[in-house]
Amino acid sequence: MFLQQFGRGLRLHKGKDHLTVLDFVGHSRAEFSYKDRFESLIGRHSRDILTEVKEGFQNAPFGCKIILEEKAKEEIIANIEGYLRSMNKNRIIKEIASYHETFRDSFSLSGFLDYSHIPFHKIYGSMTWGELCKEAGVCDNVSPNASLIKYAVTKKWLATDSYSYFSQLIKFVDCGFLCDTNTFSEYEKRCAVMFYYDLFDKANNYDCIEEMFNDLATDELFIYELKEVLKYLCDRCSAPEKEDNSVYKEWNPLRLHGVYTKAQIQAALGLSTLERKSPSREGVERLKGIKLEAMYVDVIKKREEGSMTAYKDYAMNREFFHWETQNRVREGSREAEAYRKGENNMLLFVRQQAEHPDYKCRMGFVYLGQVTMKSVEGSKPMQIVWHLDTPMSEATYAFASQYKAIG
């Protein structure tokens, strides 16, 4: 029986509000992964799955419980620990060689991931796909820009969930970066700057987009691997993107409910350019020329072993979000008056916490679009309730309401 059937059964029977599932755990083959199964059950989570199993699935979906008998728990923990231990570079290289031997004519990154069940982030753990293929004897050369792909994957793209954005990058790659940048729309220009900050941490590596594209166009191996990576990333996207609802939608490359890194957001909104990277590390950022104000919210501000510390930033429901200003903002201040009068166009970005539980990178922010103030009270900090012009998704509400659930 599939998980979808459980949900369908509950929906079709109005008087049935809960479901009990008994699953029997026995010995399993070494390559079988309980990790994947439990991650599918829990969905978005703030801690690694091994910790969840050991501590009783504290982040199971609201209203759900997962209970394991002690022996079953021991079997599952041993399985996950063994699976994680075995996922080293040498095993991956061996799997690549085996896959190439069998599927020489249709060899691809996506095909290999389906064949081996090795997680994508493990491919770029210590090397790149091209470097691993060379070690496996599949190819002779590696792109001199391989490190750029590794940086983009490990620092940016593992935290990004936006089909529209990755699709635009594929368009750049499909023309081998030999694009006429002079004809780019404002949307395409901003996507190109986002891409620049996916590859580089600092500004001023290139004077213009055309110079960057011309440089990348000379590296065929880079283009080949980048296309493989982007196609896989497109296929794995699950964010329920919608058209932007802000006053900037004519040029804004961000889509409602898409998930983006802070650097991507800053590039998309013009807070960062090729010449200047935004220095902001605060939770609020303004672009006065177009009356834009971006709010970056971590629902869980600090994570310590065995504890959860949250502040009063949380979703009250799918349409209203409770937010605390910075501590310095007091009643009667210039900032407070700007909020009261609605002087700026407020854009809300929310993530569960800063550090990603599975990858060594920062989590991405869900773009919740333009918001308007419903109420304000207090001082230093002020408490503001924002009304979302478009309700957040159920998946976002599940983590964005955590403070309300535990506070």
List each model region and its residues.
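Conserved segment of the helicase C-terminal RecA-like domain
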Residues: 1-40
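A short, structural micro-pattern
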Residues: 15-18, 342, 365, 378-380
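Short, surface-exposed beta-strand/loop "edge" segments at domain boundaries and coil↔beta transitions
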Residues: 102-104, 119-122, 175-181, 203-206, ...
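Acidic, glycine-rich low-complexity segments with interspersed aromatic residues
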Residues: 133-138, 142-153, 157-169, 173-174, ...
